[in-house]
Amino acid sequence: MDFNRRTAMAAGLGAVVAASGATASAATPTTVTVTVQGEAAARTNIPVRRDRRASGGRYLGLWTTEKPPARTGWYATYTVHVPRAGVYALTAVATAPVETPHTEAVASYPHLSVNDGPFTEIARSQPHWYESPPAWGDLSVLDLGVIELRGGTDTLTFRVTEPTVVDDTTAYVLTLDRFTLRPLEGHPALRELSVPRHREGEPALLRLALDGHTTHAYRVRYAVSDHHGRQAATGQATIAAGDTSATVTLPDLPPGHYLVRADGVTGRFARLPARPAVTGPTSRFGVNVWASSLVPPSRLADFAAALRDMGAGWVRDGQSWPAAEPEPGGYDTAQHDRRTRTLRAHGLAVLDVLSPAPEWAMTDASLPLPADLRHAYRYARRLAAAAPEALQLSNEPDVDTTSGTGDAHAAFVKAAALGIKDAAPEPCLVVLPGIAQTGPFQDVMLANDVVRYADVWAFHGYPDPTEPGEPSFPGAADEQHELARRHQADVPLWMTECGAFQKARPGEDLTPGQEIAQARYVVRSTVEGLAAGNDRQFWFAGPPLHDDGVYFGLLDRDFRPLPAYSAFAALTSLLGAAHFTGFVPGLPDGVRGFAFDSGRGERVTVVWADRPVRLDRYVTGTAYDMMGRRLPTGRPVTASRDPLYIATPADPPPPPATTRPRARLSPAEHIVLAQRFSARDAAPGKDDGDAPPPHGYRLGRRTRMTVDVYNFGATARRVTVAAQPVGGGWTVRTEQGREETRIRVPAGGRIGVDFTVRAESSVRRRIDRRLAFGAMLDDHSEVPASVALIHLR
């Protein structure tokens, strides 16, 4: 394509800097910064678009659902002239691959090739992109790292080969206004210190990498320290002239988390325990990943391997329903299915989470659920056909921003669960929504008898971020187990989110003290969760994640392990099968002890205390520190804030209990009742779960509503629907004035039954009452009831 050539004189240099649509400016009296316009590509198959906000009034703009050409991908190649060879910082005004504080717009992860070299994905983490300052519109000023140029004429090619989720579709997106090259004085310099994951007994290989080719022997002195800052090793390495890296072998170190420092650069690595953890579906340990949003495609395989090596048996992931089903019955799950296959190929069991429904499926009154629950049935059945190990039916519906109610969500849960259970003779597990906190929303859901449709009860729990000191395990587990007992729920309980709110520093994330506090809490919260009776425990989160000033991940912003990663690995390695057997009696005041059967003929006790306490007279066995390092025998064992493990031989575990058979749902359970009110009668908003009463639908003195009767069975059914007495001055009648009516519902069909709800003059305003409808088949089998809250507005 044609382009204007521009020339510019650097101040005092006399060097001509020319590029395709480029400008040069003097950053300092001795450096030249080159800016290249996005629309000035020498070769591209991406269109140029106009916008007066762009630096040249135009920009390179890719947005398409069309697959890229197999050989080239969607690409743009630029010819750039720089005054000299060297290392350059690369920045761009473009759309980031993740949401930022100023926009929800996202782009595909771009790949970059320099001088026709191999393409490398710019696979930076969510915290890195999240901090990008705004430019204009949905564009940000992005730090794309450093590159080495040969000087004179160089070429840069940006390429997109992977789609991203954009609202209700999957598309290939690249928006590039301009990019800038700034020479770095004093470079090449040390860029990275890295040690691949390895276990005790395997060699620890330290790789020292420069950001460019050195012209002379480059000598580096390095120091290695453990998680307490104690020096563990020192050494030196030489990178030969003409090379960019060198590798040296570190001395033998115990399991743990280590920092390696040299020339102002810090690296991190984990030396894992020699004994791997139990992995796969039988594991009790899980991690939230949300891979589509938080893990660049090129990193996914190594990320999955890192979780497996850490001892996570489960990952909690999800996909966008609007993107997966952009139109009724038109499914596009290929991208998510590839991620799931990658995770499972590394031995991880997958818990998938259903997202809110597509816009085409919702009405103002049904938000965030489909107005027709048959869409939920079909979508869940489609997801179950991909055979994840488990499907969770929503995430924290009790605290989202909608006016959705517990009864509506219960009907949705029933429909989706039926879709899953009808997908295969041995379907994946049905996991109830992850509830953020006990309260009226969950109470109404449970009153609708949703547990009979599920295999797992789920909830979340986080410590109070306003409490001083280190985080403490929340009371959510005890509350949920008590609630499950009250409802006689004969299903296991999973805590599908558990994490800690750690304030993040821009550009640096956690302080060393916060890192250790996070490592302690990973162990303590998991141990206390298992002791409370949780069957599975999922940490939030695995990948680097910076959300509104809070950091959650087990990996830092460069995908390197934090101390919590190593602590997690020690926990899973030492606890093994992690069958909680009881609290340890007779310990000194202030010491907490939890005993586990590892399933390997060991009893493993986990202890900690808020102040140092000697334990020599109270426990015996082989002791390990929080990172899995074996403590010397014969020395005092002291409980502290860092959890300790004491392993002793034990009798072999009893044979596992017989798994409760998963009964197939009856024809009556394939009938789902759903109350439907108009949008003007919608319940008040949930106010992040803290809204005061009333919580029910807001009715007038006379309100018409509908009970939708769904038949998810394969045979037509005759159903008698009846309103149950409300009391307190309320009456409910059909349009014919009766309390019940008999209808025929075809297989896969939906029939609406209209009712009128009346409030007498004695009814007080803003007082919730239960409105319930029951149903019965002709064989007198009872259909699970629909129970809602109503009040007079």
Where are these regions (language model features)?
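Active-site cleft segment of glycoside hydrolase catalytic domains centered on the general acid/base Glu
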Residues: 361-454, 460-479, 505-523, 553-555
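Mature N-terminal, pre-catalytic/accessory segment of carbohydrate-active enzymes
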Residues: 28-38, 74, 81, 160, ...
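Aromatic/acidic polysaccharide-binding cleft in carbohydrate-active enzymes
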Residues: 506-566, 584-586
